Regions:
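Short acidic, hydrophobic short linear motifs in intrinsically disordered regions
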Residues: 125-133
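Conserved catalytic core of two-component sensor histidine kinases
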Residues: 149
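Short boundary/linker motifs that mark transitions into or out of structured domains
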Residues: 52, 56-109, 162-172
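Polybasic, low-complexity intrinsically disordered segments
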Residues: 23-70
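C-terminal flanking helix
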Residues: 152, 156-160, 304
Length: 331
């Protein structure tokens, strides 16, 4: 199950159960590659190798099974559920409603912000005053109430009145099986952390990688900073830390060739958050597992220096315990 790099598609789609990466990471990456859409079945569907021309992909969908439709394109193969509803807010903005891509019909940048805000507020109905604040962040230089009315009308025309509902207060309605990347990532992180606690390393590995793949991409990157966006971005930054931590722990638990993945994830965690003490502990364990005990001890010294200089604290008990064990091995 070794993943050499997060961007290597073959490893991403071929080495995990359908219910995790297939539902989020594979779909996101597939959309990056020549607009291919990979529709996947329920969690318990068996894997079936299906080579995509020109890309070496291995997908895990049963091509002949309903409700899949096979479409041969010049750029590859399209496997799509006819009723698929998917919203991607991290990285490239994608909205697919019942198998139709509709984000190109959105009225403006504000239309994307409006839809994203309502999606993340589901199922709550949002008042117009709150929507004005979410879109324009206190900029009342123009008649924002009228502008919001026009924006809602155009967005409703793009997605349908059954999706964008309400008048005085507005809310988005998506099917029960709709997939929203942000929600899937946070749910996957919860599963990963739970699996780590229980020592279920394979389950933790796939869930953590799913969360990691989404949270590594910026939320609505083409939009100016807004207070609510800043809050969500910080939340997803924290989730990325958690996903990298859970992934490294899962790789350590699996052992073998996965140890290299643990080291890479721990290093990425420390690059993203140098004050994350668990990152130092995971990196020390990964290096020691690969026989690099001396380097692991150097990591401890680095942790001690960073924590002292930045926070004025010594390493905590967990990392100190790892250090003590390594000293015994090194001696």
């Amino acid at each position: 199950m070794l993943l050499d790099d997060l961007d290597q598609s073959d490893d991403l789609v071929a080495r995990d159960p359908v219910g995790e990466l297939g539902m989020v990471a594979a779909e996101m990456l597939q959309r990056e590659v020549d607009e291919l859409i990979l529709g996947l079945a329920a969690d318990d569907l068996a894997a079936l190798a299906c080579d995509l021309p020109g890309h070496g992909w291995v997908s895990r969908a049963i091509v002949g099974s309903r409700p899949f439709a096979y479409v041969d394109r010049n750029v590859g193969v399209r496997l799509e559920r006819a009723d698929n509803t998917y919203v991607q807010l991290c990285g490239r903005f994608v909205v697919e409603l019942r198998g139709r891509r509709v984000e190109q019909r959105f009225p403006s940048r504000q239309g994307r912000v409006l839809f994203a805000y309502l999606v993340l507020q589901r199922p709550r109905a949002v008042g117009r005053g709150e929507l004005i604040e979410a879109i324009w962040a206190g900029d009342l230089t123009a008649n924002r109430a009228s502008a919001l009315t026009v924006l809602l009308s155009k967005l409703r025309a793009a997605v349908g009145a059954d999706v964008l509902a309400g008048r005085g207060s507005v809310y988005v309605v998506l099917p029960p099986d709709a997939r929203v990347d942000v929600e899937q990532a946070l749910a996957a992180l919860h599963r990963a952390e739970s699996a780590v606690v229980q020592g279920e390393w394979a389950r933790a590995w796939s869930a953590a990688l799913c969360a990691r793949y989404v949270t590594a991409r910026p939320l609505l990157p083409d939009h100016d900073d807004l207070p609510w966006l800043d809050l969500w971005r910080r939340r997803l930054d924290d989730a990325l830390d958690g996903a990298l931590e859970a992934y490294a722990a899962a790789c350590l638990g699996l052992g073998g060739t996965e140890i290299a993945g643990a080291e890479r994830a721990a290093r990425r965690l420390l690059e993203h958050n140098p004050l994350r003490e668990t990152g130092y502990g995971l990196l020390m364990q990964a290096l020691a597992a690969r026989g690099n005990v001396a380097e692991a001890l150097h990591v401890y010294e680095r942790a001690r220096t960073v924590l002292r200089d930045e926070l004025g604290i010594p390493p905590g008990p967990a990392i100190h315990e790892i250090h003590t064990a390594l000293l015994g091995r090194h001696g």
